[in-house]
Amino acid sequence: MTFELKYTDRSYLPDQFKAISGNPPVEWKVTNNLVEYPEALRYMQERVENILAQNAHEQVWLLEHPSLYTAGTSAKKKDLLTPHLFPVYEAGRGGEFTYHGPGQRIAYIMLDLKRRRQDIRAFISALEEWIIQMLAKFNIKGERREDRVGVWVQRHSCQSTQNSLYSEDKIAAIGIRVRKWVSFHGVSINVDPNLAHYSGIVPCGITNHGVTSFLDLGLPTKMHDIDIALKQSFEQIFGPIIDIS
């Protein structure tokens, strides 16, 4: 099942999404080389089947992709503005078009929600809170919005010499799929990707907000430091991990 979440208040949902007592730690895997998208998709699908068969533990997989676009189940053809700029893949997750590429930290989340909470809305809220807490470690204020999924950064945007307005830009996208209550796909966080590569699509179908990154916000950050912060924040919300990298 894929899940579309729009116009829904998630602020009241609890942040904790820990597993039942006795659940093994979540495996934490980091791949440093670029991973082709079809390879990652095959891996996730196989892992989900093994989790369902109780032959594998839950896992978070951190990686980067080469430049590409993915289309979610709600993607509209008109939102692919430059079809031949990068490879385009059908993702099977919820959401619309998004960009993946070097400088973007991908976290694929393969969790058994039956061991946690069978509530996809609460799961998405917990993923957002995970990213918000990670960003706070770098003094970035990430925010969620009722009418759109993901994590957003608000900042001043001078549109003219007379007016100073706020702009809202997305720093992290979320797109998941759930099969028999086991999740896959996950989140993408813009660390220092080439933001011009988003020009080939309408990201997530949203035209009136932009995208940003750590570098764009004036905070050049090493991917290793992002990973440490992600790990610390994950344990606060989802529980213990074991590093298998």
From Swiss-Prot:
Catalytic reaction equation(s): octanoyl-[ACP] + L-lysyl-[protein] = N(6)-octanoyl-L-lysyl-[protein] + holo-[ACP] + H(+)
GO cellular component, one term: cytoplasm
EC number per UniProt: 2.3.1.181
Site (Lowers pKa of active site Cys): K170
Functional note: Catalyzes the transfer of endogenously produced octanoic acid from octanoyl-acyl-carrier-protein onto the lipoyl domains of lipoate-dependent enzymes. Lipoyl-ACP can also act as a substrate although octanoyl-ACP is likely to be the physiological substrate.
Further information: In the reaction, the free carboxyl group of octanoic acid is attached via an amide linkage to the epsilon-amino group of a specific lysine residue of lipoyl domains of lipoate-dependent enzymes.
Stated name of the protein: Octanoyltransferase
Species of provenance: Bartonella henselae (strain ATCC 49882 / DSM 28221 / CCUG 30454 / Houston 1) (Rochalimaea henselae)
